[in-house]
Design a protein with these regions (language model features):
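Phosphopantetheine-dependent thiolation modules in NRPS/PKS and related acyl-activating systems
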Residues: 2-34, 38-43, 48-79
């Protein structure tokens, strides 16, 4: 499984949404599933999936699918 596939899988599992919902336009609070609880579930899932510990500022700043990729580059998950 590629890093991108793992990233998408984390959104699907943490938010309980279908794959078609997870795309570059997805943003925090744009769907009911990505509320504050869904956000923390997503963070937890990303940390487990990629074996990282996400810093507090990055947790707050992960406000969209695209922003998440930028943040994960910092942790050398994406290039």
């Amino acid at each position: 499984m590629t890093q991108n596939e793992k990233y998408i899988k984390s959104f699907i599992e943490a938010l309980g949404v279908e794959k078609k919902i997870v795309n570059e336009n997805l943003k925090y609070n744009e769907i009911p599933e990505w509320d504050s609880i869904g956000h923390m579930t997503l963070i937890s899932d990303l940390e487990k999936e990629f074996k990282i510990s996400i810093e507090t500022d990055d947790i707050v700043n992960l406000s969209s699918y695209k922003e998440g990729i930028k943040i994960l580059k910092k942790y050398k998950i994406f290039k």
